[in-house]
């Protein structure tokens, strides 16, 4: 939803993980960079594993996450049925469970025999220790109630909407393709919608769209229909959170956001990719249950976990993420560098910034 990469500078090289026959599947992509220090390049991922991984054991789920030490952040993740520790973004070390909260490093690592002990407070994991080193758990997910960006609008949103509807998008010159926005559900009713900006479940906790509908430029919409049909063979469909976004909504986002958080929203003076009708935010849903699958991060999350190549989480979460990305890229979409859920269709720059409201499309 937000162009945070465009406001920052790429620093350093992309770290890549060393592989382990025990811990890493041959087809997983793990290159990434920490959000606070450097930003990752969205390289083409290796194909998702043909065999769907099993869910991680429930007893490990509370342990998975990031832990901050004096000089590094340690990631505890599950891969191929093993719990592992990732050091310095390069060294992946498998763990062997001894008790509920005590592990030791596997014999395949240079840390063989060292103990890893997790500590809890009222049932919640708060830290881990390795010898004399202590790593404090870093709150990441919404289940921990931290680091989920929420923006308190500077002014009442209804007033901002009224003002934005009276404003004009930036004037653009050049040759553009004709706008041909089509409604996704009219092309394929099996595409599910959960339009967050038609609800209060979003960054601003405010409703922006008067209708829960999703539109894309026709070539992008038809490509997404092909993605949805191909995914059915694997037992999945696409669930769309956002598509075409009228320019006036982008202006409201900007006007509602404090200066120190404006890097998370698009500048209306330039417009956003969503304004051009070729950007889509989406995830997968399970055809059997009808429910959205679990990914490494939540939608619109602003932590490192949102990166398309973030190595943490579980094998199944990463497999879902890579399955979506592979399917989208096969039909001409490109993933956004900092958000696994945001994809841009090829030639998106060739469309004008749009400002037509949902109610007026197709009239």
Predicted segments — roles?
Residues 9-21:
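Bacterial N-terminal signal peptides
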Residues 61-73, 328-332, 339, 344:
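K/E-rich alpha-helical interaction surfaces of small helical-bundle regulatory domains
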Residues 1-6:
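N-terminal secretory signal peptides that target proteins for export/translocation
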Residues 27-155:
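Peripheral terminal and inter-domain segments
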Residues 113-124, 329, 336, 340-345:
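Low-complexity, intrinsically disordered Gly/Pro/Thr-rich segments
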Residues 247-253, 343-350:
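Beta-rich nucleic-acid/ligand-interaction surfaces
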Residues 145-241, 256-338, 347-363:
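Extracytoplasmic cell-surface/polysaccharide-interacting catalytic and binding patches
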């Amino acid at each position: 939803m937000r162009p945070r990469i465009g406001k920052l500078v790429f620093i350093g090289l992309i770290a890549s993980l060393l592989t382990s026959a025990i811990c890493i599947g041959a087809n997983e992509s793990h290159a990434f960079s920490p959000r606070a220090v450097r930003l990752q390049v969205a390289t083409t991922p290796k194909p998702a594993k043909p065999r769907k991984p099993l869910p991680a054991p429930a007893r490990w789920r509370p342990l998975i996450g990031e832990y901050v030490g004096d000089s590094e952040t340690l990631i505890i993740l599950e891969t191929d049925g093993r719990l592992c520790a990732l050091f310095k973004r390069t060294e992946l070390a498998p763990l062997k469970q001894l008790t509920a909260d005590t592990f030791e490093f596997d014999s395949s690592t240079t840390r063989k025999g060292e103990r890893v002990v997790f500590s809890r407070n009222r049932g919640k994991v708060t830290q881990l220790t390795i010898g004399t080193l202590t790593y404090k758990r870093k709150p990441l997910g919404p289940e921990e109630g931290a680091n989920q960006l929420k923006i308190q609008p500077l002014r009442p949103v209804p007033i901002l909407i009224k003002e934005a509807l009276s404003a004009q998008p930036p004037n653009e010159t050049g040759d553009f393709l004709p706008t041909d926005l089509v409604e996704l559900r009219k092309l394929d009713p099996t595409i599910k919608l959960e339009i967050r900006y038609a609800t209060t479940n979003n960054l601003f906790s405010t409703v922006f769209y008067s209708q829960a509908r999703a539109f894309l430029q026709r070539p992008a919409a038809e490509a997404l229909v092909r993605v949805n049909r191909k995914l059915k063979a694997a037992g999945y469909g696409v669930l769309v959170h956002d598509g075409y976004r009228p320019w006036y909504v982008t202006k409201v986002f900007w006007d509602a956001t404090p200066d120190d958080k404006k890097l998370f929203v698009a500048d209306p003076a330039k417009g956003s990719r969503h304004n051009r009708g070729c950007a889509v935010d989406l995830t997968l849903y399970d055809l059997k249950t009808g429910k959205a699958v679990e990914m490494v991060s939540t939608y619109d999350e602003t932590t490192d976990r949102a990166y398309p190549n973030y190595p943490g989480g579980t094998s199944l979460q990463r497999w879902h993420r890579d399955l979506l990305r592979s399917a989208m890229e096969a039909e001409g979409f490109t993933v956004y560098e900092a958000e696994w859920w945001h994809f841009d269709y090829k030639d998106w720059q060739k469309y004008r910034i749009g400002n037509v409201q949902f109610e007026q499309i197709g009239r």
